[in-house]
């Protein structure tokens, strides 16, 4: 169906298209200019036009699509080359000598124009928005032939047919950008006037009136330029294109569309990304980072693995980070890319990194500050046994396990403190970090008194082995100790941050007194790091440090196989168990340890399994660890968690191979590596390790950690601006003054190590193993049906835990306190009492005593996220407004902070202050346009996107990123910012800003829906009784748009 009109625009005769149709209604019609009949035709749709057009005589096919500027449209280019030679009927060929343009140089220029279009597209859309354009997405048509004057004319249309822009202004601006990048001699060939507010553009199969040059598809051209071979007519149409992706608005102020999400590469990730460039950097140098792309400058010609040819001029190399994967791109070929690998924390990063270590393209040794000491203060050698120790005030010894550090220490003690020495009556204190390690040391130094075998003060004993937690039994005296020995010194420092000290203050005070005043100090550790150096320099800086380092690589005959695939690791384990090999399995995950135990028991019921974890009884740990030679000699499989580390050593050659499973959610890399050495001799010297860990963003330097720590306390002294949620210092409390005690400095050093492990767990683990001299390879293997069964067992274990807790005895506060005290003091607690204690803690947390609970209740409400969200909701809804709630929380935490600084600083540093996290979360919410966590208002897409752009362009989210350990988003990408904000709201309150049918509102996450805000207590489930006053709805969205999933119904339950 069609209608015809003489004119397009309105006139007094009523014969124009606009007399009948508004611009809005023309969106759904197809308008054609009929040049032959000098008419405008309006068709109901495109199909009607194609059907009608097919029946028209050839000479009348002079049709042009009418493109209205306000409608979305494809990007298009009209290319015309000047006429060079007349044709006559009897002369079919151009005189090449007189011709300026022939097929070859026309094609060269056309190829140049296509390249520039792709380059500008890359710069405009690929770089900031990760939207790629390939040659196969470019449609090339031609109308080559004789014009009205019988002259040869080259004419082409270039159409980017898979994409559209919002309007003609966007198209015009993009075309201008292309023209700016064309060489001057090419510029005249491109028509700049093809993006007017009303544009006629010739339709495929049509010609101009009086000319036989028909616009057509050209298969030969498509082959030459490697462009699209489509012959679908609708792909050539410009206006309101269907099946296209609408590109972001770049050149106009319209905010209806938003860019696709692409994260910005963080500075902390850049070094890791650059490592993937590897040998490519021989011909390129780093240029800059643009969002998720790393750009390089060419320094010399090189072979391109993507294009399979040499490039010698352009800056073609680009690395793109999508998610955590790193891809290599070439500007000359947008169709292909090479996966280089993945950043830390992703599934195939392990294999990629091991491959780089195997090819020695990675430096695995991490230098420490001790190595920078002058030659007069260090003794470095490479021998299979230890040399004699120096008699110096501060001696630091580094060497791998089983090279004889303790043997040489005994020789040192015999020489300087033996019966024939002048110092035989001098005081010696040997400090250890674990009770079992203390007993192990005593077996080697029988003339020392073990702290646990005597009662009362330890000062009367000249030679004492004492665990860190029992240092309070020593006192400072007028005379310092003569020799202080710190074996496994890094672990000793860790132990001061364990939270297990019953008498922390006196224990740490006596430790620091001995460290600062002892005549001689010896520190020993295979994993010696900068923490020890910094602590010694700070507190024993008046005497020089002497570094004794035996670099002998005892592990050079060991072989490690790494993988990130649990399936590959399990299949190898199963294969070795089927071959009746005896296996050692250390893991830093209690759940994984329990899962492996159940999995192996079901598969191999005849095998004996030794299992040790924090859940093992105190009696079992003490009896077994004191006689591992006997007890471990009875088992086929040995599974243990960090409960076993230094101090427990099995020397017999019983076990064949070690299978380790580690992640970055538990202890640090150094502790994990220590766990590998508890069985000293493996028959095969083979270690098969599965490493897993998500990407984290913890502050890594002492300066950043200190800034973040002080900032959290700083905000407690500031006055909140109710309107802008910003801070000013209170006149009453003033600006805080912090006293940086010895423990404060030790705590900072310990946090640095923990954060490095959380952020770079996989690389640090592999580096430390490779640095021992061990050979590293990638673990491979056949795929068997084990993972589904493994996962099923995991669910069974979790469900049984839920059942045990739900069905446990309901105990009172007195019994719960007794169980807690027994656990703290290492007294064995019955398993049923442990479940009863877990049940009590769960009921106490939600104030849910007196209610019967089910396994499903335990599953839902005993999760970390649900508890964290519940705490956040309770804290933010105590007052009548969020401002009042924030002020109440600030006052509470400030009072605790001031008490802790006066009485027990370690409590302050270990306390999780939450005020600042609330402050940031509410600030983000208000910047989005919502007043509080229970705001029922609805924002349109335009309202929210405008807020995100206007509010966050100048706002630095670094502090918020630090607070929530999240990657900082790109400030120019609203969708990425919203994703970041929703992560914050989800972590703090179990909320998100939800999108539905073009509107945004506050909605519960899955965890948040379990703990609704209510006006008064309900009986059905735990809830948050909120004091927040209702927010008046001010949204312009009609009431009926609130569905059953609206924020009002989800975030506030009336009783």
From Swiss-Prot:
One Pfam family per UniProt: Herpes_UL52
Molecular function, one GO term: ATP binding
Keywords, comma-separated and alphabetical: DNA replication, Early protein
Annotated coiled-coil segments of the chain: none
Spans through the membrane: none
UniProt record, GO biological process: DNA replication
InterPro entries named in the record: P-loop_NTPase, Replication_origin-bd
Tree of life domain: Viruses
Induction, per UniProt: Expressed in the early phase of the viral replicative cycle.
Entry similarity comment: Belongs to the asfivirus F1055L family.
Function according to Swiss-Prot or TrEMBL: May be involved in DNA replication.
Entry protein name: Putative helicase/primase complex protein
């Amino acid at each position: 169906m069609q209608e015809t009109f003489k004119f397009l625009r309105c006139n007094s005769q009523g014969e124009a298209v606009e007399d009948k149709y508004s611009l809005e209604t023309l969106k759904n019609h197809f308008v054609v200019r009929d040049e032959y009949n000098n008419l405008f035709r309006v068709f109901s749709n495109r199909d009607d036009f194609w059907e009608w057009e097919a029946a028209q005589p050839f000479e009348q096919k002079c049709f042009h699509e009418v493109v209205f500027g306000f409608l979305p449209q494809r990007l298009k280019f009209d290319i015309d080359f000047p006429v060079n030679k007349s044709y006559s009927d009897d002369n079919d060929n151009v005189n090449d000598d007189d011709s300026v343009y022939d097929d070859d140089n026309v094609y060269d220029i056309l190829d140049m124009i296509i390249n520039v279009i792709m380059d500008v597209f890359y710069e405009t859309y690929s770089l900031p928005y990760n939207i790629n354009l390939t040659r196969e997405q470019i449609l090339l048509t031609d109308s080559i032939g004789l014009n009205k004057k019988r002259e040869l004319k080259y004419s082409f249309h270039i159409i980017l047919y898979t994409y559209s822009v919002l309007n003609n202004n966007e198209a015009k601006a993009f075309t201008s950008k292309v023209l700016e990048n064309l060489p001057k001699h090419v510029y005249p060939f491109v028509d700049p006037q093809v993006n007017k507010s009303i544009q006629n553009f010739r339709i495929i199969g049509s010609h101009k009136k009086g000319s036989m040059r028909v616009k057509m598809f050209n298969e030969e051209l498509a082959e030459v330029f490697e462009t699209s071979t489509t012959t679908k007519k609708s792909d050539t149409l410009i206006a309101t294109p269907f099946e296209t992706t609408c590109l972001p608005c770049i050149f106009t102020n319209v905010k209806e569309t938003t860019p696709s999400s692409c994260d910005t590469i963080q500075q902390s990730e850049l070094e890791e990304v650059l490592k993937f460039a590897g040998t490519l950097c021989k011909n390129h140098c780093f240029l800059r980072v643009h969002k998720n792309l790393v750009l390089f400058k060419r320094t010399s010609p090189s072979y391109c693995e993507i294009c399979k040819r040499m490039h010698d001029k352009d800056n073609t190399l680009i690395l793109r980070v999508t998610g955590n994967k790193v891809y290599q791109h070439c500007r000359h070929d947008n169709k292909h890319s090479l996966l280089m690998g993945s950043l830390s924390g992703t599934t195939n990063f392990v294999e990629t990194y091991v491959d780089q270590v195997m090819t020695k393209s990675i430096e695995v040794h991490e230098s420490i500050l001790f190595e920078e000491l002058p030659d007069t203060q260090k003794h470095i050698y490479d021998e299979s046994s230890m040399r004699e120790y120096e008699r110096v005030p501060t001696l630091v010894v580094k060497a791998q396990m089983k090279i004889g550090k303790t043997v040489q220490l005994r020789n040192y003690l015999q020489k300087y403190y033996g019966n024939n020495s002048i110092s035989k009556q001098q005081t010696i204190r040997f400090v250890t970090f674990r009770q079992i390690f203390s007993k192990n040391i005593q077996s080697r130094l029988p003339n020392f008194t073990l702290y646990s075998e005597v009662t009362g003060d330890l000062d009367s004993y000249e030679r004492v082995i004492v665990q860190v937690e029992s240092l309070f039994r020593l006192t400072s005296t007028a005379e310092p100790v003569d020799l202080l020995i710190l074996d496994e010194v890094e672990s000793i420092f860790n132990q001061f941050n364990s939270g297990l000290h019953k008498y922390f203050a006196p224990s740490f005070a006596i430790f620091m007194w001995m460290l600062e005043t002892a005549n001689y100090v010896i520190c020993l550790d295979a994993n010696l790091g900068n923490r020890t150096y910094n602590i010694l320099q700070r507190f024993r800086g008046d005497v020089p440090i002497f570094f004794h380092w035996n670099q002998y690589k005892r592990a050079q005959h060991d072989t490690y196989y790494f993988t990130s695939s649990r399936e590959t690791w399990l299949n190898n384990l199963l294969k070795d168990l089927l071959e009746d090999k005896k296996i050692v399995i250390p893991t830093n995950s209690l759940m994984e340890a329990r899962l492996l135990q159940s999995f192996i028991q079901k598969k191999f019921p005849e095998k004996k399994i030794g299992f040790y974890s924090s859940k093992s009884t105190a009696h079992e740990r003490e009896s077994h660890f004191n006689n591992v030679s006997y007890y471990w000699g009875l088992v086929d499989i040995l599974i243990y968690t960090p409960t076993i580390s230094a101090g427990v050593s099995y020397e017999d050659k019983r076990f064949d191979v070690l299978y380790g499973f580690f992640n970055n959610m538990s202890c640090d890399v150094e502790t994990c590596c220590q766990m590998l050495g508890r069985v000293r001799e493996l028959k095969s010297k083979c270690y098969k390790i599965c490493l897993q860990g998500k990407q984290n963003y913890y502050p890594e330097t002492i300066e950043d950690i200190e800034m973040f720590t002080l900032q959290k306390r700083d905000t407690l002294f500031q006055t909140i601006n109710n309107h802008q949620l910003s801070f000013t210092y209170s006149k009453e409390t003033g600006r805080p003054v912090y006293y940086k005690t010895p423990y404060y400095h030790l705590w900072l050093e310990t946090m640095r190590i923990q954060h490095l492990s959380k952020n770079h767990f996989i690389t640090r683990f592999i580096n430390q193993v490779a640095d021992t001299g061990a050979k590293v390879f990638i673990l491979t293997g056949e795929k068997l049906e084990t993972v589904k069964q493994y996962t099923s067992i995991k669910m069974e274990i979790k469900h049984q835990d839920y059942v045990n807790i739900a069905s446990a005895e309901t105990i009172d506060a007195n019994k719960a306190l007794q169980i807690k005290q027994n656990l703290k003091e290492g007294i064995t607690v019955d398993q049923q009492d442990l479940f009863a204690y877990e049940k009590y803690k769960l009921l106490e947390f939600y104030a849910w005593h007196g209610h019967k609970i089910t396994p499903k209740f335990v599953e839902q409400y005993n999760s970390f996220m649900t508890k964290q969200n519940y705490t956040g909701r309770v804290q933010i809804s105590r007052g009548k407004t969020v401002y009042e709630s924030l002020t109440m929380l600030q006052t509470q935490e400030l009072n605790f902070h001031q008490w802790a600084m006066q009485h027990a600083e370690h409590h302050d540093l270990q306390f999780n202050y939450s005020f600042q996290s609330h402050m940031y979360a509410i600030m983000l919410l208000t910047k989005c346009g919502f007043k509080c966590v229970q705001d029922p208002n609805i924002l349109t897409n335009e309202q929210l996107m405008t807020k995100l752009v206007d509010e966050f362009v100048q706002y630095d989210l670094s502090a918020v990123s630090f607070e929530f350990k999240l990657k900082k988003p790109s400030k120019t990408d609203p969708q990425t910012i919203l994703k970041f904000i929703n992560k914050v709201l989800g972590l703090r309150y179990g909320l998100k800003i939800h999108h539905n049918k073009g509107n945004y509102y506050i909605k519960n996450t899955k965890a948040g829906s379990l703990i609704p805000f209510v006006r008064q207590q309900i009986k059905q489930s735990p809830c948050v009784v909120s004091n927040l006053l209702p927010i008046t709805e001010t949204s312009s969205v009609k009431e009926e748009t609130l569905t059953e999933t609206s924020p009002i119904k989800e975030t506030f339950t009336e009783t």
